[in-house]
Curated annotation (Swiss-Prot):
This is Antifungal protein 4. It is found in: Secreted. It comes from the Eukaryota. GO terms for cellular component: extracellular region. Keywords: Antibiotic, Antimicrobial, Fungicide, Secreted. Thermostable. Still active after heating at 100 degrees Celsius for 20 minutes. It comes from Malva parviflora. Antimicrobial activity is not affected by salt concentration.
Length: 37
């Protein structure tokens, strides 16, 4: 669980830093789907 939280925090940082969140959002979706199954 802690690892997942850290990954989420890193993605949030990247989202804030990156002006084009499209790629980050897609990566986040992939991670979520990968986690679920």
């Amino acid at each position: 669980d802690r690892q997942i939280d850290m990954e989420e925090q890193q993605l949030e940082k990247l989202n804030k830093q990156d002006r084009x969140p499209g790629l980050r959002y897609a990566a986040k979706q992939q991670m979520x789907t990968x986690r679920m199954g």
